[in-house]
A protein has these predicted regions:
Chain A
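Intrinsically disordered cytosolic tails
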Residues: 250-254, 258-260, 271-274, 278-393
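Extended non-catalytic domains of envelope/secretory-pathway proteins
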Residues: 177, 199-213, 217, 225, ...
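Transmembrane-helix bundle segments that line or gate the permeation/cavity pathway
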Residues: 1-16, 20-193
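Membrane-helix interface segments in multi-pass membrane proteins
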Residues: 81-119, 217-248, 296-343, 391-393
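Select subsegments of transmembrane alpha-helices in polytopic membrane proteins
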Residues: 65-79, 203-215, 284-296
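Juxtamembrane inter-helical linkers in multi-pass membrane proteins
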Residues: 45-60, 134-152, 182-204, 258-282, ...
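Juxtamembrane/interface segments at transmembrane-helix termini
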Residues: 37-45, 123-139, 172-186, 248-265, ...
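Loop-centered beta-sheet repeat module
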Residues: 169, 177-230, 237-238
């Protein structure tokens, strides 16, 4: 048994793309019902491609339980959303003035935002539940991961930290990142061993430096424009500052990931190391986006060409319905291909890069860890499925 | 056949390198290691399952068929990883159910129960609870707010149909306007309405009319052109007044707001899904309920009768609409949301038979002016 375990990832593009494409077609044919099985199968692939010390991870969730969890969630959501939206419309009509169109637009904006506020706590709740479900269905060497319940606690804290981050114009973002991750990490287990998030939230400010530089350039550009009344330089500064800010945000996420991983401890003994680099992450994203963009341009170009060459028939109304169906199919296929490519060319390479940049230290201690009792409360992520939270996989 | 596999007992994190051998006579796979209880385990080949969608083709991760459990967290956890290519191919060949997915007993019943509950809850919300709440709440909206809201709706409709600038689509021919006012006066003289009517004609070829909250009614130019007599226009107008007086539009707006997005919850976001959702939501919310339509018809017939106008016109307009329906497969909105034209025409004819003496609602000069209101 080695004392250090290097993460490895064995997944490749072709089989994953095939799996995505096949399950996406089934999803369309079943009017969306197969999507729970589709997501489960893709997770099984990605989990099983990940390995440490030669032993693969296992995703033991099932599409069936996801579907059943979803059915429960829509009952609750239908009642909650239906009543809330109707009451909101009632208040909108009876209180907010709508005599001129300006006010009507403002009223609509308010109503839409309130509606998001109604769903936001549920989405945060769903986020925690989704992570808990994924943990409970993840195994390595036959030992389950797990997470304690605490979704409402997470939702309320997250709401508070989001509010704090907004009113401090992002200055307290590191506090939110750190405390929310700590809330989740401290409730996480591998077998009968507990994780703990160490470190200090103030340490994350080092990762914010490029965000601050980007903002600084934008502000300096604006000040310069006001003082000298030269708009040209302000424009250049705005573009540079904006790009710097975007890259700075990625840098922050990578920095936070590395820091939080390095400061996690399992069972007070097992440590972790991660050294992702911002440049590599951006490269995966940019290369993937360019390749997919070019491919899609070609495919949609061909479809547009066919439409253009037949436009006289379409205008004259002599085009048969079969032609429209014949065009709709390649159009839908092109979307499926784009989805599959982004999974294979962006998501999977990112996972591979992250997994292979991670090391488990003092891994000998893992041998002494025992199985945990099953988390019967960690039922499927129905709310996450219904509200579409949880990201790429 | 001998080889080595990695065994995890599902209880501790310890990895055992077990010796594997297939006993073809007993149809079992033997796992042996000094640390195993009794030194060995026997896995029946029929009960061996491989984890599905496994990324590594050169490897099998095996488990034993679990006792049925719906909660996947409860499934038995012993795992055996086989990397040796010969052993992998032998096991693939000899284990009859290696790729099988075991579905626990009672699954179908459980799906049916939960799906039934979910569909039931949605149907109850969309067709019973939300309409009932909309009916109750609509009564608490002050009339002046309803009028303001209705005007905003009409303005939005106008922009949606292509109206731009100050005047938009509203037709302002003064003689036509006078004829329209005469028609409204004739219809409403005997009636005691709770709303001040604001009737306008939009310059649009669609054969349609609609009512918005607070007494707002819009007739399309296409509808006036399609009508053979002024009484046919009056019939449609009276029907829309019926919707206004019953507050159908306000209730509809509340109901539509409540059910918005509920369908997209179910269908999720897959390719083409959003288009289906939009169409389904439109048909669900753009139409009044069947009862509301029937009541508006009854209201219209009685209003025509009180004004001394011939209710037969109501029927002849339905006849000409159903003819239009046959000619053009893409239904105008008025038709698609007002079904069963033949039945409604018959009801109007039956009503007209009992009517006394009637007079045309407009004279020929006024009718000609109304037809030119948009020029
Ligand atoms: Zn109607």
């Amino acid at each position: 048994m080695s004392s250090q375990i290097q993460g490895r990832y064995f997944g490749t593009g072709k089989p994953l793309f095939g799996l995505y494409f096949k399950t996406a077609i089934l999803t369309i044919l079943t009017l969306g019902i197969y999507r729970f099985w589709a997501k489960t199968r893709i997770r099984k692939y990605i989990w099983s491609a990940t390995s440490g010390d030669g032993d693969s991870f296992e995703y033991s969730g099932t599409g069936l339980e996801k579907f059943l969890g979803f059915l429960v969630a829509i009952v609750i959501l239908a009642i909650y959303l239906g009543l809330f939206q109707l009451l909101l419309a009632f208040i909108g009509i009876s209180i907010i003035p709508e005599d001129d169109s300006q006010a009507a637009i403002a009223a609509q904006a308010v109503a839409i935002n309130l509606s998001i506020l109604a769903v936001l706590p549920l989405m945060l709740f769903a986020q925690y539940r989704a992570r808990r479900y994924k943990m409970a269905r993840t195994r390595w060497r036959g030992i389950r991961f797990g997470m304690e319940k605490g979704a409402w606690g997470y939702a309320f804290r997250a709401l508070g930290y989001i509010f704090l981050t907004i009113i401090t114009l992002g200055l307290l973002n590191p506090l939110a990142t750190f405390r929310l991750e700590k809330y989740m990490a401290d409730r996480s287990w591998y077998g009968d061993a507990r994780f703990e998030q160490m470190g200090r939230w103030q340490d994350l400010y080092a990762g914010m430096k490029h965000v601050f530089i980007g903002l600084g350039i934008i502000i300096a550009g604006v000040v310069f424009a006001i003082v000298t009344e030269g708009v040209g330089i302000a424009g250049v500064a705005a573009v540079i500052g904006y790009i710097w800010l975007l890259i700075g945000l990625i840098y922050y996420r990578v920095y936070a990931f590395n820091y939080l991983t390095r400061n996690k401890v399992l069972d007070e003994r097992v440590m972790f190391d991660a050294h992702l680099e911002t440049g590599a992450v951006i490269k995966i994203f940019v290369v993937g986006t360019i390749v997919i963009g070019l491919l899609m341009a070609v495919i949609f170009g061909i479809i547009a060409g066919i439409v253009a060459s037949m436009s006289s028939a379409i205008m004259a109304g002599t085009a048969s319905p079969a032609l429209f169906v014949g065009l709709a199919i390649p159009y839908a296929l092109a979307f499926l291909i784009a989805g599959g490519l982004s999974l294979v060319m962006i998501t999977q390479p990112m996972i591979k890069y992250a997994v292979e940049s991670m090391t488990v230290l003092n891994a000998v201690h893992l041998d002494t860890i025992h199985q945990r009792a099953a988390d019967t409360g960690a039922d499927a992520e129905g709310f996450a499925d219904a509200l579409d939270v949880g990201g790429a996989i | 056949m001998q080889s080595v596999g990695r065994f995890f007992d599902g209880e501790s994190g310890q990895r055992l390198s077990v010796d594997l051998s297939v006993d073809t006579a007993a149809d079992t796979l033997k796992l042996s290691h000094p640390e195993l209880p009794m030194g060995s385990q026997y896995w029946p080949l029929v009960a061996i399952r491989a984890l599905s969608d496994h990324a590594r083709q050169d490897q099998l991760v095996l488990s034993l068929k679990a006792d049925a459990a719906l909660d996947s967290a409860l499934i038995v956890t012993a795992r055996l990883t086989v990397d040796d290519p010969d052993m992998v191919s032998i096991l693939r060949r000899l284990c009859p159910d290696i790729g099988r997915v075991d579905v626990p007993k009672g699954t179908t019943g459980r799906i049916a129960k939960r799906a039934g509950l979910a569909v039931g809850a949605l149907v109850l919300m969309i067709f019973v609870i939300l309409p009932a709440m909309a009916n109750t709440l609509a009564r608490f909206i002050p009339v002046e707010r309803e009028v303001a809201y209705g005007k905003a709706v009409v303005k939005q409709m106008e922009r949606f149909m292509g109206g731009r600038g100050d005047q938009g689509l509203t037709c302002t021919g003064s003689k036509g306007r006078a004829a329209l006012d005469a028609m409204i006066a004739r219809l409403t003289d005997a009636a005691d309405l709770q709303y001040d009517l604001n009737v306008n004609v939009f310059d649009h070829k669609m054969v349609n009319a609609f009512a918005a909250p607070g007494g707002q009614i819009v007739l399309m130019r296409g509808l006036i052109e399609r009508a053979k007599t002024p009484d046919e226009v009056a019939g449609v107008l009276a029907h829309e007044i019926g919707h206004v007086e019953a507050r159908d539009t306000t209730r509809n707006a509340l109901r539509a707001a409540g059910s918005a997005g509920l369908l997209s919850l179910i269908l999720g976001d897959f390719a083409g899904g959003s288009a289906v959702v939009v169409v389904a939501e439109y048909t669900l919310t753009a139409s009044y309920t069947r009862e509301a339509e029937a009541e508006a018809d009854v209201f219209a017939l009685e209003m025509l009768n009180a004004a001394g106008a011939d209710a037969t016109a109501f029927a002849t307009f339905f006849d000409s609409l159903s003819e239009l329906e046959r000619l053009t497969p893409d239904l105008p909105e008025y038709l698609s949301t007002h079904p069963e034209l033949v039945d409604r025409a018959a009801a109007a004819r039956a009503f007209a038979r009992d009517q006394g003496v009637t007079t045309p609602i407009l004279d020929d000069a006024e009718w000609a002016a109304l037809k030119k209101i948009c020029t």
